[in-house]
């Protein structure tokens, strides 16, 4: 599903964010990218999403070498992935329902499909009763659940979560990790970038 072959990323400043990375994440796995702040975790995610290009090496996603993928094909690559960011990136003027539905509008899903899929994924993340609320009315853990719901709503084969527990208290952090485990048990490949080694252990 994801394979890095001798991948190096060096920025124009000379900073080597990733050096000779070699790893494989198979379909259905739950994988962690672990390291302190500035260790290259976010760069790895950007490379997977093709937001950054490797300086050298090859990146294979779902059996396709993305190294020379045309820019016009990148949106199609990303449709196989759901991404939840540390800062949530929720739309403040839209309800929970509309924040999640927005990801479906972008891929031109039918209104009927949206009406069916959004309540289903909100139920999965435990937010059925919060659909009409706005982000500023939610706790940090609830906002993270909205971000996860939005990442999952288009049924991606892979979920990438960048520091999903970074802004949360310990109890809420474990709730989110349990949710990610449940998502993985349903067959979705899960990749979590984190600095919290206790969560990995």
PLM regions with names:
Residues 49:
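Helix-to-loop junction immediately C-terminal to a conserved catalytic motif
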Residues 57-65:
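Conserved ABC transporter NBD signature motif
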Residues 94-101:
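Short coil-to-helix segment of the ABC ATPase nucleotide-binding domain corresponding to the Q-loop/switch region
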Residues 133-138, 142-144:
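Conserved ABC ATPase signature
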Residues 148:
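Hydrophobic anchor residue at the start of the ABC signature
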Residues 153-157:
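A short, proline-enriched helix->beta-strand linker immediately N-terminal to the Walker B motif
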Residues 159-162:
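Catalytic Walker B motif of ABC-type/P-loop ATPase nucleotide-binding domains
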């Amino acid at each position: 599903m994801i394979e890095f072959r001798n991948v190096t990323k060096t920025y124009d400043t000379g900073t080597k964010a990733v050096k000779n990375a070699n790893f494989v994440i198979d379909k259905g796995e739950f994988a962690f990218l672990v390291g302190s702040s500035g260790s290259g975790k976010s760069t790895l995610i950007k490379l997977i999403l093709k937001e950054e290009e490797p300086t050298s090496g090859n990146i294979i996603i779902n059996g396709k070498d993305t190294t020379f993928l045309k820019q016009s094909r990148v949106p199609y690559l990303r449709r196989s992935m759901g991404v939840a960011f540390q800062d949530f990136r929720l739309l403040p003027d839209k309800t929970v329902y509309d924040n999640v539905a927005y990801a479906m509008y972008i891929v031109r899903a039918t209104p009927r499909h949206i009406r069916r899929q959004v309540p289903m994924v909100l139920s999965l993340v435990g937010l059925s009763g919060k659909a009409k609320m706005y982000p500023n009315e939610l706790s940090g853990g609830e906002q993270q659940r909205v971000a996860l719901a939005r990442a999952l709503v288009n049924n991606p084969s892979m979920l990438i979560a960048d520091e999903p527990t970074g802004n949360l208290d310990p109890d809420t952090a474990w709730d989110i990790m349990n949710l990610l485990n449940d998502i993985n048990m349903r067959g979705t490949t899960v990749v979590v970038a984190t600095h919290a080694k206790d969560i990995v252990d």
